[in-house]
Design a protein with these regions (language model features):
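Binuclear metal-dependent hydrolase catalytic cores
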Residues: 1-171, 180, 237-249, 253-255
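Cap/insert and terminal regions of metallo-dependent hydrolase folds
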Residues: 175-255
């Protein structure tokens, strides 16, 4: 299994428009963060996790091949605002999109023309699949277990993906998690989880909270995503973090 971080930034991206802070003026490519999204690939299956407004830019450097499914974590624009840009991939067939009921409703409201009885030629051909926590499913050779985390008071989905010996857990926008959900993460080999900044935030984990959560899960390697400009510069933050818990960066490829 191969994991590509297409975007590792928060809803405003980094640099933030109009900002001249220490992070935003950095010339290090690792400090340029598009909105969160990831590509997960095996020899036979290709999945996208979230499809934000930077999708077109993110996918241009990737081979043009079928996308077998899109997993949506929640119904916020920075995680599904790029869905209209999947239309070139519809030449391979309908795009299967998997989301919880609230995100499915948001998709219908955001892209009503994709679900009309008589669709305009060329609009994305999307097949929505309503999924729920703890109800596993399979796409190709990847087994997927959705579980629930809390984005402040909004229940959203995390995903555990397994294929052969590869075992990846992906979480974004989490603030808290019910202890009962931890059973669904037990034994995972790689954790991807959000770390917004150092100061407390009402709906996202801080860096310290993410580190504590990583220790609780106990995965051999953890990558931190959904980071804002307030987190500081990539290299300096990583130098202060344990070697097994590091900030991810846009374009990073991990072989599992």
């Amino acid at each position: 299994m191969r994991l590509t971080f297409l975007g590792t930034g928060t809803s405003c991206g980094v640099p933030t428009i109009g900002c001249r802070c220490y992070t935003c003026i950095s010339t290090d490519p690792h400090d340029k963060r598009l909105r969160c999204s990831a590509l997960v690939e095996t020899a036979e299956t290709r999945l996208l996790i979230d499809c934000g407004p930077d999708f077109r830019q993110q996918i241009m450097n990737q081979p043009f091949r079928r996308i077998d499914g899109i997993l949506i974590t929640h119904a916020h624009y920075d995680h599904m605002g790029g869905m209209d840009d999947i239309r070139p991939y519809c030449q391979f067939g309908e795009i299967n999109v998997y989301a919880d009921p609230l995100a499915c409703q948001g998709m219908l409201q955001m892209l009503p023309y994709c679900f009309a009885e008589h669709r305009y030629p060329g609009v994305p051909a999307i097949r929505l699949h309503e999924i729920r926590p703890h109800e596993p499913f399979r796409i190709g050779d990847i087994h997927i277990m959705p579980f629930q985390v809390m984005h402040h008071d909004l229940p959203i989905l995390g995903y555990r993906l397994t294929s052969d010996d590869a075992d990846l857990t992906y979480i974004t926008d989490m603030k808290t998690i019910d202890p009962a959900e931890l059973d669904y993460l037990s034994g995972t080999r790689m954790l991807v989880v959000n770390a917004l900044r150092h100061k407390p935030h009402h709906s996202h984990q801080t860096v310290n909270e993410a580190v504590d959560f990583a220790h609780l899960v106990g995965a051999p390697q953890t990558w931190l995503i959904h980071s804002s400009h307030d987190i500081g510069r990539h290299a300096e933050v990583n130098a202060q973090l344990p070697s097994d818990i590091q900030l991810a960066y846009d374009g990073q490829v991990i072989e599992l």
